[in-house]
Amino acid sequence: MNQNNINKVPLIIYIFSSIILVYIFHNSRSKTGIIIPQISQTGMKIINKKAYYIYFISFLIIGLLASNFYLKELNIKKKSTLTKILQFIGLVACFLNIVQGYYPLDTHKKIHEISAYGGIFLHLLVLSVWLYYNRRKDLITIISLSWLSILLMGPMRTINFNIGSLFQRLCVFFLLLALYMY
């Protein structure tokens, strides 16, 4: 499989696993007003093992394939030190993605949220710096939408939980779309 095809896999995995996890969420809990759960929310005090493994395996694969991108694709010409720093930060972000998958929101909220939002922030930071040196309008738009989604998530969650969760999902979707389009 060539590198361009590998870069497409995380978005496809994210879409399929999200659909499956939302389905499991709605079939495994009492009815509430939550239509769009947070990405990793199973809605149970006792973890649904099927949901847990789908989530963990999907973020394990996403983290590993994204780390492949940082190691093989991320480059800033004539800035080898900056490239190495960004690659390292990107790898840390990928590790945090794997940690977030291992520790579910329902049972390890603090660890999960620190690793999830820390990973998102580091990915956005690395890709924003990379785009500063490698202007690509399509990717600038996508990363800007990801930044906007994560910045609006908090205020939107106070208005309506479903809208906040939608913005959280959009942020990750746009990050993976950028990798897909790379």
Model-identified regions with their sequence ranges:
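N-terminal topogenic module of multi-pass integral membrane proteins
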Residues: M1-I76
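Aromatic-anchored segments of alpha-helical transmembrane domains
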Residues: V22, V92-V99, W147-R157
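Membrane-interface helix-boundary motifs at transmembrane edges
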Residues: N2-I6, L71-K84, Y132-I140, F161-N162
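Terminal transmembrane helical module of multi-pass membrane proteins
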Residues: L131-Y182
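Hydrophobic residues within the alpha-helical transmembrane core of Major Facilitator Superfamily
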Residues: Y23, L64-S67, I98, S128, ...
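Membrane-proximal helix-loop-helix units in multi-pass membrane proteins
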Residues: G90-N134
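Juxtamembrane "helix-exit" motif on the non-cytosolic side of transmembrane helices
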Residues: H26-N27, E73-N75, G101-T107, Y133, ...
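Alpha-helical transmembrane segments of polytopic membrane proteins
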Residues: S40, K49-L60, E113-H123, S165-L175
